[in-house]
């Protein structure tokens, strides 16, 4: 942990996944690990608050990057484009997140603009977790 080395004040951001906020079949180990991120984030937010260290988590939906393209092909070899289309259709904004979308959310949580926010899960998911 970095927290013992932090002076009083600061921000810790845990990157998780929308899987940490929901459940779905055939992914229990992955979903369990992402829900664990939420639990440790909330515990640390409570523990670190007296030192004015804020702890939050971001939960991206699928992100348009090389890793996701590899996963799409892994889900259905030769049908990656169809997998992507199906996943995008499950997102109300009808697109994957971008790396920049996630970076901007992290930047906000790290900034003084969020100085009174701790212990929250920020879904960066185009509405995926609300439907």
Q: Can you say where each PLM-predicted feature lies in the sequence?
A:
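Active-site helix of classical SDR
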Residues: 33, 41
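A conserved structural motif in NAD(P)-dependent oxidoreductases
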Residues: 78-79, 91-102, 113
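Hydrophobic structural elements of the Rossmann-like NAD(P)H-binding subdomain
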Residues: 13, 55-58, 68, 119, ...
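Alpha-helical segment proximal to the catalytic Tyr-Lys
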Residues: 4, 46-50, 115
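Short, flexible catalytic-loop segment of classical short-chain dehydrogenase/reductase
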Residues: 38, 55, 60-74
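Short C-terminal tail/terminal secondary-structure segment
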Residues: 22, 106-107, 118-131
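Active-site loop immediately N-terminal to the catalytic Tyr-X3-Lys motif
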Residues: 22-28, 50-51, 94, 112
